[in-house]
Amino acid sequence: VIYTVECSFADPDSEAEWNDFYSLEKLPALISVTGFHTSQRFRSIGDGCPVYLAIHTIDGIDVLTGEEYRRKGGGNFARWQQHITDWHRNLYSDIGPAPAVKADERLVLCASGPDPLIQMGLAPLALQAVALERFPERRWLAILPQENARLVENVRDDLHLYAPMTQQLTSTRPLSTAQKK
């Protein structure tokens, strides 16, 4: 299952410190939680969506309601909570492990259908919301070489482009059978 967390951050004075915390402390803590298999963080390029996006591969919603998640990952950023805006969480199914996006690539998300991505010569993966907010209900994601990113910027309101802020972290624990698609 793909777990997404999106948000913006409203305090420019502490945003760099927030980013260090999230990328250097929170993501490694999350990947240590049983049931988390991959984690990667992104920053949007452009407007019309939350600034930050984290994409995780997890075993299912039970991981997010467990004690280990509460202890190591969930809710451990009370210091920053007042500055977090436009916060959204979703669980999506149907693609297996989240693809790793390299430093010289961009992640493209589209909620209006796969056609814009296919027309760009990309191979979109379909995401179907299964829990939490369930909005957008369907999304398509694809990986774009960085040199082609200018083709996407400001072309369509329904395409959102993201640059990776971190490498994809991976757990040493095996994926559940359902995740190995």
Where do the language-model regions lie?
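Macromolecular interaction modules
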Residues: 1-181
